[in-house]
């Protein structure tokens, strides 16, 4: 199996790489950081920032030329930081979060889509978030980026309908990763990354259009989407906020 994963140096990306690694696998691992672990099979690292579209295009061309179109591409790279939506000083953070979580995701999948479409097979998967269903105080940049990722993946799915290429949107809740370990509040239904990777892989194998992980967060997401605005505003305003002093 030929699998490409972005953000593969830690967290969910590392767990997914470990999950898919086997003596028969070929993994293209894309990250701006070094990989502090070894895997079975053929592993091809690419030191690429997903905000660098030309570099992504070169990495995709190299992988396809050497191994053929991937069976699966997972756009996982992401960043998160607390923001104040009413402060001009935080617009720079918003721009950076959107560049990675939305533009980087779109560029990753678009770099590999033509070869997969020509082959008439494969799966393009994007890691969004439960945070993309409603806006949260102090977390506007992250919520906006994930909401945009959800709708962008939906658009991509409809565009590729009938091509043989599937598009899967994964919306995790809290996963125990370096990104969430900076949070200074209790995170309900927290999953270890290895378990998250297993559940994500199952959803991808089933070609689910949209999968919320874990199931408890799926129930919460349904409630969030139907909750009246007046009630949601009261609850969300009192919710704990992500730290603003995080390097992204």
Predicted regions and their residues:
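C-terminal helical subdomain
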Residues: 169, 185-221
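Active-site helix of classical SDR
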Residues: 109, 145
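Conserved glycine-rich Rossmann-like NAD(P)H-binding loop of the short-chain dehydrogenase/reductase
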Residues: 23-38
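Residue(s) in the substrate-gating loop at a strand-loop-helix junction
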Residues: 129
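Conserved glycine-rich cofactor-binding loop
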Residues: 9-10
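Conserved mid-core segment of classical short-chain dehydrogenase/reductases
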Residues: 80-95, 138
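Rossmann-fold cofactor-recognition segment
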Residues: 41-54
